[in-house]
Amino acid sequence: MKYFICLTLAVLVSACQSPAIDALSVPLNTLHQNSDIAGKVAKPIRHKGQDYWLLTSEKLGVLLTDQNGKKLSSTDGNIELLDWRDNIQLNGETFGLIAALDSNLGQVLIIKLDWQTLELSEITRLPKTSAQIESLCWYLMPQGHLSLFTADTLGEVAQRTVVDGSQQQLTDLLIQTFIGTPQTKSCVVDDTLGYLYLAEENIGVWRYLASHESELSRELVIATDPNGPVMGEITHLDILPSGELLVTAPEQKGVWIVDTQNNNQAQFVILEGSHKPESVSAVMQQQSIRLGVFDDETGQYNASALNRDSKPLQTTTSSMQAVTAYAETTPVNAYGDAADDPAIWINFADSGNSRVLGTNKKQGLLQYDLQGQLLKEFNVGRVNNVDVRYGMKFNGKRMDIATASNRSTKSISVFTIEPKTGELAFLSDIKTDIDDVYGLCMYQNAEQYYVFINGTDGHYQQYLLKPNGDDISGLLVREFSAPSQPEGCVVDDQNQQLYYGEEAVGVWQVSAEPIDAKSELIIKTNEIFVADVEGLSIYRYKGQRFLIASSQGNDSYGVFALDDKNKHLGSFKIDMDITTRVDGASETDGLAVTSYPLGAQLPQGLLVVQDGRNRLPTAPQNFKLVDGLQLQGLLQSWLEKL
């Protein structure tokens, strides 16, 4: 038997050509008749060289048997679906954990397998859902947490953390929800590569990135007829250590093995003697693959073996370190690309009452306290970037100033800040002739206050702010251009240097003074510092300056030693913190940082970043707040290696 595959990584091409693939054939051996068990999954498992089976049963719950099918332990319940992960740490002990759907209760049960006693026992239940769950699958996250994906009859996929890997304790924390596929028959996660696979029964198998911080996108891995080789519906998925995907095809009386690392090439395995295989599960057994097959027509559990060496994937472990946020701001008021750029205003009279400003480019400027609570909002238009400076002589007194690039009015929106209270007030707009204003930052040289503003076409303008009675006007004093689209920028006032990002290229440096000066490209994007370059800010530590830049292409933040030839010290990510229930940050646009002590709680300052994908649970965008102490820890570890 030969099958012709015309599948590429993400696109079905009707005119493609591909070599014929010979089908393998393996015999089945009866493990159990369904008359006494009545279930749908036979999961082969292996622990310390010993082979076992996990069976689902409508009458007996979950059964653990030896390799010959002899019952060792069981639980109560009407169970049809399960998934399994071994070597999970709970309270200092190691267990196997089973997620099983009880059809009578309509709930997911979490069951542990104690390897010392070979006993199964239920340890918790997840909350009931409004729609019936159709499939479930474990995901062992890179942080060590164990989470579970479920897909329901409405097509909603939910991910929730079940085991806190850092505390080795059970938890129940909804991470994210999204609309997956209708009629999701099965799901499985490749923990090593971080892929979630969903089987849409009459369409094919879709692949998603499993990380909750990843962009929600999908690609078709293997399709049903007429667009692919699978005849009829797909009923079950499993994954091999090699990353190969097992796709059960009942009408073809077999299973497809899809090489997800090799252009999704597929090989078909005929299950000899089967009538309608509903599920095919697998485990590595030395140089072969042990298969567990449930046949829906005969009601039999069957066992088989495939002589195939499925070597575990060899992956490069990322050396990127991570920090966590201690708090997050109130989400903006609508979904979509809205939150963009933060700024930190320091209350020098009472630093613990400093403020965070944030732009909502669908609404205006927002003001938060240091715990992220929304204090005030100004509906002044689609403001994009914001910055602050201190002590301007204005209207007979000293006031702090915030400015923001306003895309609605093609202007610089000016705000005053009362130095002792943080009271924020909108003042006026300074018109520009930039067609599509974008990024903005400020520069202060003694009593001279400047604003740099750019457009999406790369054009930069520098304005001198001029107090004028009870208003502030702007005088255009300089213009220059970046080669392509910029956005984020920051000025080192003390050294009179402007740093600005060219999103696809890197970071440029030029004099901040209103003179004709040549820009120099000092930092280039690479495989670690990945475009787009977005937010920029400067952190000071032990008398040195460090530029922090958001690397939107891989959801990270690059740190560069400005006083050491702009050396890239390293990059870091912001991960979720289950204890505080604050998620990490991804797809970051703007950021702001200070090393100035902000009260007793933040003696080493603060980092604020925009979060493009707000999770725990899924919500509109917001900003994440990171204790500067964590930044100092990273810097110290990097500097010690120099």
Regions found by a protein language model. Give the residues of each.
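Sec-dependent signal peptide recognition
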Residues: 1-7
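C-terminal motif of bacterial Sec signal peptides marking the signal peptidase cleavage site
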Residues: 13-15
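Sequence/structural signature of beta-propeller domains
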Residues: 17-642
